[in-house]
């Protein structure tokens, strides 16, 4: 059964394993998420559930959002996400999904929005080496030639050039759940995940985990 939760990145810390190893972890507030809608293959063409996260007052949401959440018997939510599932009958509208959906040792994929760095040059954005810093050199951080004039007389697609860095959807795969605090809905994920503090993330079962 596929599992997934919407969460919020709290920050990074470190814990120590029983054998004394120091493990860097990212703390994620995962859930509670409420099942808002069920989609079936017969009606919608695929099996999925829609979950809501970060409850807010109905007065602060538009009428369409309030009406959509009414069937779940809960107020409005700030964020929604669909999750493909194998057996949609395992869920009911109004079910609450918490951090205990995952357990220590699970392998997961985490999706978030990377921190935006603004407009950056090719050295920071793509890791170009750059030119010499010595006296007399007139080539330091410039990208250099981007193509020939006669042939091909154009710049190829996907040419590495200066531009916007960060602020894009990033998925880090095959991370390990180190610890789960069900009481506070916290999941400790080994390593780093995309996004800034309090950034929205989506946790789901890894698609490349070894069976």
Curated annotation (Swiss-Prot):
PROSITE patterns: RIBOSOMAL_L3
GO biological process: translation
Keywords: Ribonucleoprotein, Ribosomal protein, RNA-binding, rRNA-binding
Highest rank taxon of the organism: Bacteria
Gene name in the database record: rplC
Entry GO MF terms: rRNA binding; structural constituent of ribosome
Assembly and binders: Part of the 50S ribosomal subunit. Forms a cluster with proteins L14 and L19.
Family membership: Belongs to the universal ribosomal protein uL3 family.
Summary of the function given for this chain in its UniProt record: One of the primary rRNA binding proteins, it binds directly near the 3'-end of the 23S rRNA, where it nucleates assembly of the 50S subunit.
Protein name, entry field: Large ribosomal subunit protein uL3
GO cellular component: cytosolic large ribosomal subunit
